[in-house]
């Protein structure tokens, strides 16, 4: 069990720990069950070579049920409300260190409150525009995975409607999940320093 900021300082010397906490927060937001092996760490001999930086890579398997009904997930009933399907070795620090847990909750608030920006919404709109612009019948018929899910697709119009509806569905799902997390008393308490309350942590994890 770590006290104070020592744990953060040690980890941050090895890895961009704030970036990792934000990646973990995003994975919790979209209920990803495959975030551990979808993370790319990189370093450079030219700059800051002893410290790894992060780059998200193919964050798939979102809005899925945790493996084995969450039996392998780290944390207790309280922390699992805002730490979804956490199974990474480094994640164990969060449920042993109150300082690290507070830092995680603050980054979760950052991602939830500032991450879904107008700019990201504009990206969704642009994706819709590109789908409509680039899709043709030949391309639509080549979308084998999509047509397997919905065999009735046999034209560009059919494929465009299905893809755009999917975009809108996940956009709505993400917003609903965001509001659920923001209503959590521990997440909300971490947003305002004056309202902070301790999160029950696991002594052995």
Predicted regions and their residues:
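Middle-to-C-terminal accessory/interaction subdomains
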Residues: 1-39, 43-205
